[in-house]
Curated annotation (Swiss-Prot):
NCBIfam families: rplP_bact (TIGR01164)
Gene Ontology cellular component list: chloroplast; mitochondrial large ribosomal subunit
Family: Belongs to the universal ribosomal protein uL16 family.
Family annotation (CDD domains): Ribosomal_L16_L10e
Protein name from the UniProt record: Large ribosomal subunit protein uL16c
Any one GO BP annotation for this protein: mitochondrial translation
InterPro entries: Ribosomal_uL16, Ribosomal_uL16_bact-type, Ribosomal_uL16_CS, Ribosomal_uL16_dom, Ribosomal_uL16_sf
Keywords attached to this entry: Chloroplast, Plastid, Ribonucleoprotein, Ribosomal protein
A Pfam family it matches: Ribosomal_L16
Sections of the chain in a coiled coil: none
Compartments it resides in: Plastid, Chloroplast
Gene Ontology terms for molecular function: rRNA binding; structural constituent of ribosome
Domain of life: Eukaryota
Length: 136
């Protein structure tokens, strides 16, 4: 599971997800990519599930790049706890993604294999996304 080695602060505010992604929205490494169409928090488990699905489908052929990293801690309060007495403890990590962000890139396989592998990974994600091909 992906998570930061260390952070300056244990807990963070939730924040807002306005606008579009201004960085990380172009294909940089591979030939095919999965691009997000909605804003969301994507958990480390979802990122790993998508990566595994793509790797398995491609039968370890080609190369896969994960373009996002979960660096935001999400806190959860214990069940049946009264209000007050501080913020809950960090439970899992999420990556904040805005529309236009590239999640995965892939190369070294045919387009049909890449399209199928990326669609399987897209089904693991909690949001709508689209397949991109690098125009040469």
């Amino acid at each position: 599971m992906l998570s930061p080695k260390r952070t300056r602060f244990r807990k963070q505010h939730r924040g807002r997800m306005n606008g579009k992604s201004c960085r990380g929205n172009h294909i940089c490494f591979g030939r095919y990519a999965l691009q997000v169409l909605e804003p969301a928090w994507i958990t480390a488990r979802q990122i790993e599930a998508g990566r595994r699905a793509m790797t398995r489908y491609a039968r370890r052929g080609g190369k896969i790049w994960v373009r996002i990293f979960p660096d935001k801690p999400v806190t959860i309060r214990p069940t049946e706890t009264r209000m007050g007495s501080g913020k809950g403890s960090p439970e899992y990590w999420v990556a904040v993604v805005k529309p236009g962000r590239i999640l995965y890139e892939m190369s070294g396989v045919s387009e049909t294999v890449a399209r199928a592998a990326i669609s399987i990974a897209a089904s693991k994600m909690p949001i709508r996304s689209q397949f991109l091909r690098l125009e040469i």
